[in-house]
């Protein structure tokens, strides 16, 4: 089976925060799982280097947009690598290959009659003497009356036209823009109304889109899909490939989502592989992002794919809700955020991955609390999982000289483990990652109970053969926890693999156990709870 996984592209205008990771982490869990299953996986993403936020940041700092994009693209790559993300291709939207692919898609849509020219009114700043891209216009949402940008309202998820905003202001200088006529290209989104409606009806039956994606897309369909501009007067971006319009750029809402396609083509070019199987209707596709990106993946991207004749419209939409920080809405402008480069300097990446999975905002907003983060590490990763692994391997090291005793696998344990592979696998495929991880940790707690009830420290004296059986079965459980937890906790899984010399990474019950173990080191270190107060003080102290 061909599995395509697309992770949303973060804007390269500032550091990643935990809200980004909470929405993107499911993509890596899926990729690791399906590779272990032996499926053909293509997992792609990249940095959005063409967006208006980058141009604004560059203007504020007095540097070029490329300077900003380079800085954060490199930081993103480093953060994703240090968090264990296993992208097959992580690229950027200001690359030549991306520009070429996007222009080709634009021309195909134009040739098929899905793009047309239209004279429209657009916000123009007399002070800055320029037409204003949508994100350069800020004001009040006409639907919910909250503060909004010219392209979208984060409060109610409405896709907006800048001229719809109330109390419009230029983001650059704060003046009220005028309205002038200009010519732009438009995407005939309304012509895909019935196909998008059918797609939503289908996923309501299969349950392969998150509820928030279904509800929001149904709302758009009910209101009637509106044609959208595909060109803008932007300072950076992909030039319109039509003579006489080269000074205009392809609008980022269609250009950025086409990044999945351009990354796929770039991967194929680099590896010599054929990527077409990932764009056929039989492909199993997952798009992983936050709920603010839903309409771009549930309406616009499917319409673009249909418009160019590709069959792989999004089968799974993994659109997480929002992550708050210490019960407050995350705000980058106010510096109310936990920044990824910062937390990675001091904490185990598996601790971050664990907390953002068991506490994932899958169906509702959830909160990142330093207290909960540190206590979950100490109680679950260290106290449950680390404790079981350490007490078993230390027992072998102390009483068997590092040689794993001989034994036979308990039938009940074998059935439990094989059932766990099936249950966890199904949960991952259904994008129920929290359920999957909690199921494994239920088994970890069962394993600790098994160790306690068998009391190998007593068996060793009273019944050495039973002791060997107990320890052998504990090693069997550890070897399988390593595989089951690989998609979630890859770093600790790798450490145990090295200790036990486990080579097999397949998603199946491990029956061949190691004969000996190498030097045993603690799997996790205890975090001093005094860190809670320190981290909270640091967070409040950084607020602007």
UniProtKB/Swiss-Prot annotation:
Give the CC-aspect GO terms.
cytosol
Instruction: Tell me the cofactor note.
Output: Binds 1 zinc ion per subunit.
Which GO biological process entries does UniProt record here? methionyl-tRNA aminoacylation
Q: Which PROSITE patterns match?
A: AA_TRNA_LIGASE_I (PS00178)
UniProt-annotated location(s): Cytoplasm
Extract the SUPFAM superfamilies matched here: Anticodon-binding domain of a subclass of class I aminoacyl-tRNA synthetases (SSF47323), Methionyl-tRNA synthetase (MetRS), Zn-domain (SSF57770), Nucleotidylyl transferase (SSF52374)
UniProt keyword terms in alphabetical order: Aminoacyl-tRNA synthetase, ATP-binding, Cytoplasm, Ligase, Metal-binding, Nucleotide-binding, Protein biosynthesis, Zinc
Query: Per the UniProt record, which EC number(s) apply here?
Result: 6.1.1.10
Catalysed reaction equations from the record: tRNA(Met) + L-methionine + ATP = L-methionyl-tRNA(Met) + AMP + diphosphate
Spell out the HAMAP family in the cross-references.
Met_tRNA_synth_type1
Task: Give the multimer and partner information.
Answer: Monomer.
- What does the function comment of this entry state? Is required not only for elongation of protein synthesis but also for the initiation of all mRNA translation through initiator tRNA(fMet) aminoacylation.
Name-wise, this protein is Methionine--tRNA ligase
Q: What is the lineage of its organism?
A: Bacteria, Bacillati, Bacillota, Bacilli, Bacillales
């Amino acid at each position: 089976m061909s599995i395509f996984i697309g992770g949303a592209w973060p804007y390269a205008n500032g550091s990643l925060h935990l809200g980004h990771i909470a929405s993107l982490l499911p993509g890596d869990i899926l990729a690791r799982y399906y590779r272990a299953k032996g499926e053909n996986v293509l997992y792609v993403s990249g940095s959005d280097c063409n967006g208006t936020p980058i141009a604004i940041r560059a203007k504020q700092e007095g540097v070029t947009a490329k300077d900003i994009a380079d800085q954060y693209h490199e930081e993103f790559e480093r953060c994703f690598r240090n968090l264990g993300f296993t992208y097959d291709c992580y690229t950027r939207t200001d690359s030549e290959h991306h520009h070429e692919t996007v222009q080709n898609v634009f021309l195909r849509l134009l040739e098929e009659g899905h793009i047309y020219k239209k004279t429209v009114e657009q916000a123009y700043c007399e002070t800055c003497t320029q037409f204003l891209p949508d994100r350069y216009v800020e004001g009040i949402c006409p639907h919910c009356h909250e503060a909004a940008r010219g392209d979208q309202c984060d409060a109610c998820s409405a896709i907006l036209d800048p001229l719809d905003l109330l109390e419009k202001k230029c983001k650059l200088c704060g003046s009220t823009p005028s309205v002038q006529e200009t010519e732009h290209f438009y995407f005939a989104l309304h012509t895909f109304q019935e196909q998008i409606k059918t797609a939503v009806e289908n996923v309501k039956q299969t349950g392969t889109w998150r509820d928030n994606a279904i509800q929001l897309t149904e709302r758009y369909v009910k209101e009637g899909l509106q044609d959208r501009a595909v060109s803008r007067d932007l300072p950076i971006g992909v030039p319109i490939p039509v003579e006489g319009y080269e000074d205009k750029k392809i609008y980022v809402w269609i250009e950025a989502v086409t990044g999945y396609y351009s990354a796929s083509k770039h991967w194929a070019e680099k590896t010599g592989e054929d990527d077409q199987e990932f764009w056929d209707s039989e492909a199993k596709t997952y798009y992983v992002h936050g709920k603010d990106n839903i309409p771009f993946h549930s309406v616009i991207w499917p319409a673009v794919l249909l418009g160019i004749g590709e069959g792989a419209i999004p089968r799974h939409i993994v659109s997480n809700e929002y992550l708050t920080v210490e019960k407050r809405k995350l705000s980058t402008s106010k510096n109310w955020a936990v920044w990824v480069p910062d937390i990675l300097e001091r904490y185990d990446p598996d601790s971050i991955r664990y907390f953002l999975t068991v506490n994932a905002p899958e169906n509702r907003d959830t909160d990142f609390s330093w207290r909960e983060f540190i206590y979950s590490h100490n109680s679950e990763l260290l106290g449950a999982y680390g404790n079981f692994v350490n007490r078993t391997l230390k027992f072998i090291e102390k009483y068997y000289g590092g040689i794993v005793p001989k034994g036979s696998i308990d039938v009940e344990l074998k059935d439990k483990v094989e059932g766990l592979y099936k249950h966890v696998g199904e949960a991952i495929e259904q994008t129920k990652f929290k359920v999957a991880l909690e199921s494994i940790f239920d088994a970890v707690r069962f394993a600790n109970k098994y160790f306690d009830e068998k009391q190998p420290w007593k068996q060793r004296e009273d019944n050495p053969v039973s002791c060997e059986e107990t320890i052998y079965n504990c090693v069997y459980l550890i070897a399988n926890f390593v595989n089951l937890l690989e998609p979630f906790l890859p770093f600790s899984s790798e450490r145990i693999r090295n200790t036990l010399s486990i080579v097999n990474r397949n998603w199946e019950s491990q029956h061949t156990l190691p004969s000996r173990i190498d030097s045993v080191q603690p799997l996790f270190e205890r975090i001093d709870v005094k860190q809670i107060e320190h981290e909270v003080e640091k967070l409040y102290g950084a607020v602007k």
